[in-house]
Swiss-Prot record:
Ranges that cross the membrane: 3-23, 57-77
Record's subcellular location: Plastid, Chloroplast thylakoid membrane
Keyword flag Thylakoid: yes
Listed name of the protein: ATP synthase subunit c, chloroplastic
Top-level taxonomic group: Eukaryota
GO cellular component, one term: proton-transporting ATP synthase complex
Gene, per the UniProt record: atpH
Length: 82
């Protein structure tokens, strides 16, 4: 494999995981903050809020997993290598 392609693949894999984690990380922090605020306002709605929060965490985390899949594809099944 061309060393330039290998180096670019490693850099792109690192960037794909790093950038894919920024948005969901910020979203999870915001969602958790609002969930705590909502539970503090209405303690009787804790179960519903927690369920919605965990479901939204799963959707947000799937975006990070997509970035990881792209990184693994670049590292181990590189489409640019001959």
């Amino acid at each position: 494999m061309n060393p330039l392609i290998a180096a670019a693949s490693v850099v792109a894999a690192g960037l794909s995981v790093g950038l894919a984690a920024i948005g969901p990380g910020m979203g999870q922090g915001t969602a958790a903050g609002y969930a705590v605020e909502g539970i503090a306002r209405q303690p009787e709605a804790e179960g519903k809020i927690r369920g919605a929060l965990l479901l939204s965490f799963a959707f947000m985390e799937s975006l990070t997993i997509y970035g990881l899949v792209v990184a693994l594809a670049l590292l181990f099944a590189n489409p640019f290598a001959s």
